């Protein structure tokens, strides 16, 4: 930053020190008496070097000589805060006070540096105070963390925290942030117990607050960042691939667990002769929660909640039970989707065979009439069959099958037919 009609960058250091020391003495001589009237406001046109060095030296003098006045100036919004034109609210007084102390400590060796170093320190201090005024919750935006790192390591810690906060703001302002968040939440939902899902929804409801905190940092940023675009695209693809791998992992291991449980049930049934459905603890349904609770109480009293072999409690917890129920539902859905086409084909085949085996009602009435008229000997000749084919429009095979089935259905209901057959057999 260049200031016209002021000191140049190459001003000798001894001249800078003498002139600022002269202004320092003039400022101490101009200090008003508390019992006297307030002095007249100083004229705005000051001699060289400039108002920047004067303001810095005034803050340094107030901090070292009179701590009470320094604290009052900080609380009233004076000092460096007014110098940087940062309007901090009353709730941020602690943060602004800490920032002013950090700024005053960092300007102690100011007389041993040139004019460009002074400008750099003011810029870093301004960024730190902006971060302190933006948020009190984020670890990257907390003024305490910035102050601690600056006091221990010079000024690099505050700059690093400030850069981390800006990187987060750039990610939140990126167009791919919503797909990134959705992919991340989808990975979290896999194999999560049903009773734990509301916690994820509650955290998603608070995401707007986080976006609002970092939105102030991303207002003046340039939107074209190829490195950030590539990072966002690759990370979204990575999360989507990770989601598929997690789903496959859960399904395979869940299927193995179900098959192992089925094998254990079969082995137990072969040893005891009792099916799992006949026992009192066959399932973990909601109707048996009371029985499970009573068994758990007895188990806790006898073994203090742990088994002697160190394998943990034998009775599943509520989270494990909800996870088992979710695995059952997912397996049921997968089986339906996998065998849906085969089930539909089998059902259509059964219905088609049923429709093919049934004759129309008008044709069966003709066949039944012939059956009633020839009840004593219900065996049509070839001529009778040819005439029935013409009357009904059926095939000869269908007529033969109908008479065979009809004789089977009425085998014992027609005594005359049975006597005729017996007489023929005797001959």
From Swiss-Prot:
Free-text tissue specificity from the UniProt record: Maximally expressed in sepals, petals and fully expanded leaves. Also expressed in other flower organs and in developing leaves. Low level expression in stem internodes.
Biased composition (Polar residues): 272-284
The entry's keywords: DNA-binding, Homeobox, Nucleus
One annotated GO biological process: regulation of DNA-templated transcription
Subcellular location: Nucleus
Main location: nucleus
Signal peptide feature range: none
Stretches assigned to coiled coil: none
GO molecular function: DNA binding
Protein name: Homeobox protein knotted-1-like 3
Species of the source: Malus domestica
Biological classification of the source: Eukaryota, Viridiplantae, Streptophyta, Embryophyta, Tracheophyta
């Amino acid at each position: 930053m260049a200031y016209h009609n002021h000191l140049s960058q190459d001003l000798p250091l001894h001249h800078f020190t003498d002139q600022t020391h002269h202004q320092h003495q003039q400022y101490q001589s101009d200090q008003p008496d508390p019992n006297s009237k307030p002095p007249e406001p100083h004229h705005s046109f000051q001699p060289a070097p400039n108002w920047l060095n004067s303001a810095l030296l005034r803050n340094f003098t107030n901090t070292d000589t009179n701590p009470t006045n320094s604290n009052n100036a900080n609380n009233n919004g004076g000092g460096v805060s007014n110098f940087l034109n940062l309007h901090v609210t009353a709730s941020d007084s602690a943060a602004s006070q800490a920032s002013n102390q950090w700024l005053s400590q960092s300007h102690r060796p100011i007389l041993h540096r040139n004019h460009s170093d002074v400008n750099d320190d003011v810029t870093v201090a301004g960024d730190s105070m902006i971060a302190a005024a933006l948020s009190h919750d984020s670890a990257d935006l907390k003024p305490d963390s910035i102050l601690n790192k600056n006091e221990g390591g010079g000024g690099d810690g505050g700059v690093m925290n400030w850069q981390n906060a800006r990187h987060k703001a750039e990610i939140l302002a990126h167009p791919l942030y919503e797909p990134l968040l959705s992919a991340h939440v989808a990975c979290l939902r896999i194999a999560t117990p049903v009773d734990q899902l509301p916690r994820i929804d509650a955290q998603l409801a608070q995401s707007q607050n986080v976006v609002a905190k970092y939105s102030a940092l991303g207002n003046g940023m340039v939107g074209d960042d190829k490195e950030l675009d590539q990072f966002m695209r690759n990370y979204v693809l990575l999360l989507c691939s990770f989601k598929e791998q997690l789903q496959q992992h859960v399904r395979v291991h869940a299927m193995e667990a179900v098959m192992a449980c089925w094998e254990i049930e079969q082995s137990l049934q072969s040893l005891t002769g009792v099916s799992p459905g006949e026992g009192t603890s066959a399932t973990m349904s909601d109707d048996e929660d009371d029985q499970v609770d009573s068994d758990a109480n007895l188990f806790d009293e006898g073994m203090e909640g742990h088994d002697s072999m160190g394998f943990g409690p034998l009775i599943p917890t509520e989270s494990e039970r909800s996870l088992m129920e979710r695995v059952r539902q997912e397996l049921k859905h997968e089986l339906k989707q996998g065998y849906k086409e085969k089930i539909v084909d089998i059902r259509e085949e059964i219905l088609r065979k049923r429709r093919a085996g049934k004759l129309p009602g008008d044709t069966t009435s003709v066949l039944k009439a012939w059956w009633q008229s020839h009840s004593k000997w219900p065996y049509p000749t070839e001529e009778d069959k040819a005439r029935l084919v013409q009357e009904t429009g059926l095939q000869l095979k269908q007529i033969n099958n109908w008479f065979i089935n009809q004789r089977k259905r009425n085998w014992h209901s027609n005594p005359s037919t049975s006597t005729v057959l017996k007489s023929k057999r005797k001959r």
